[in-house]
């Protein structure tokens, strides 16, 4: 130690004391690990020797540099580079709950990536990669990985069978007793990336068995929706349960997300930061090209708006909301919405479930000032459904007080009221958090639909399942029995289901060629099951009141034209044909058929007032209808009480437009009606300037 001057003890490692020292030759601060050899076991001495051996092989700006080792006072002394910025774990802890910018995350991540690539190139496994072993320079800009005490140099005859490392970062294959390999380091890399994005560990538990269970099932909360889909997907790929599905380091570095950060790293590290005055940019006079997306909104012109449009908007009306109310958003794009009796739910492009709820009593927004006479506008708060373990939601459906969602892996989860067995868990128990419908785990599901108290689900192999309340034959099982577990539904020969729809007490299927089959209550011929020619009315004994199994529609023209969209209301239904025509059938008590007459006909009728307008989507509430045009026009008709039509009108027997508070062109992406409520999602469509 004559070449060094001890300054202070900075830590106590697994095998010894860590000193901060001054190297006398150049007055440089260094770290010296003092490892007492005499008290060490053979394995511990091997680990200490191994660290020296590994550090000698490595030479990289993002790996702690090795200087020398020597014996003194019956202890092995290892001199290495000092990183004054502390550990990455300390850096994360000091952030509290203030999330890092994505650019900062990637700046750190690609340096760790380069370091690990250098290590693997020398056929070395780190085996203990964690934020506590990742160090920072004094500016906290340069990352250096260290602590190679339990690294393993691979030879053709050795396999790293020992289970080592910090438990929170151990991969699933290690939990199973399989050999440690490079993909295990990549799992740990994913844990570090997750920690950078979430400021917390991906896997934590009160005890080791619970931790192993979490790791083995790959259950971790999704990272914030503020980050790009590419970053979120990178986390998921690194934390794949199957080692073979984790990308190799070269593939990670080749991803556009990382290439940009790597380029910035090589051009910016060591540069001197300078302030730069931003010059004002004169508005461009170039014209704009027409986008291929059909949209509604302000007229297009060469001047682009100063304020960028939101990614998407979700509107709600009905239930006392007389006009469309834009719901609060969490800086995300909602691609699909679903309305229930009380629920308002949506799915974001990044695969998170967003819910809109009334604020708690006393939270403001719902009280009147003394002397006020007007009713306050109802307020809603938005929140992401928490507690989901790294799952990506791609579709949501709502019933009466319960919700079903479908993940990108084809798994259905349900939560809410368990009455009538509509959660599919084999009981009537209420469940507050989304829970997997275990009976369907052997199938990859592609769609789920909810009625008031029953559910239909469709698999990739076009297998159909139903559960919940069964009266009127709504489950299509040939009986009126209820079921609390999914039951496979028999399909008529030659029919292949493509889409499922549920109503209050009935169900419908769209088949691959565009035909429709229905079961359940056919009151008022709301399912179109009466066998009718155009303009014909059935005699009473020919009227079909209910069907216990899925049956082809028999009322013209529904049995003749391919159908694109269909929805079921309480006492009526609506369908859009391949040619863009909208037909309604069932009860017209409140004008919900759009014929400007309250006639009591059981025959389907073409909606009046939409001539020349091609329709694309339709949704039915309890006594009203909402239709969306191919150009994203929004129309409603039927009962107007409590804001059902999205305007101040009373009942309207003919379609009238619904005005949305949009200042930018938009396209409607999803619509859902339930009882007296409507949810509608729109996506902003911006025109890109024509390149010069």
Curated annotation (Swiss-Prot):
Residues 282-293 have a biased composition (Polar residues). Highest expression in thyroid, adrenal gland and skin. Low levels in spleen, colon and uterus. Overexpressed in breast tumors, with highest expression in infiltrating ductal carcinomas and moderate levels in mucinous adenocarcinoma. Changing residue 87 to A: In RHPD2; likely pathogenic; contrary to the wild type, it fails to rescue body curvature defects in zebrafish morphants; decreased localization to cilia; decreased interaction with ANKS6. Transmembrane segments: none annotated. GO terms for cellular component: centrosome; ciliary base; ciliary inversin compartment; cilium; cytoplasm. It is found in: Cytoplasm; Cytoplasm, Cytoskeleton; Cell projection, Cilium; Cytoplasm, Cytoskeleton, Microtubule organizing center, Centrosome. The modification Phosphothreonine is found at residue 162. One of its GO terms (biological process) is animal organ morphogenesis. GO terms for molecular function: ATP binding; metal ion binding; protein serine kinase activity; protein serine/threonine kinase activity. Disulfide bonds: none annotated. Its EC number is 2.7.11.1. ATP binds at residues 10-18, 33. Pfam families: Pkinase (PF00069), WD40_RLD (PF25390). It is linked to Nephronophthisis 9: An autosomal recessive disorder resulting in end-stage renal disease. It is a progressive tubulo-interstitial kidney disorder histologically characterized by modifications of the tubules with thickening of the basement membrane, interstitial fibrosis and, in the advanced stages, medullary cysts. Belongs to the protein kinase superfamily. NEK Ser/Thr protein kinase family. NIMA subfamily. Required for renal tubular integrity. May regulate local cytoskeletal structure in kidney tubule epithelial cells. May regulate ciliary biogenesis through targeting of proteins to the cilia. Plays a role in organogenesis, and is involved in the regulation of the Hippo signaling pathway. This is Serine/threonine-protein kinase Nek8. The lineage of its organism: Eukaryota, Metazoa, Chordata, Craniata, Vertebrata.
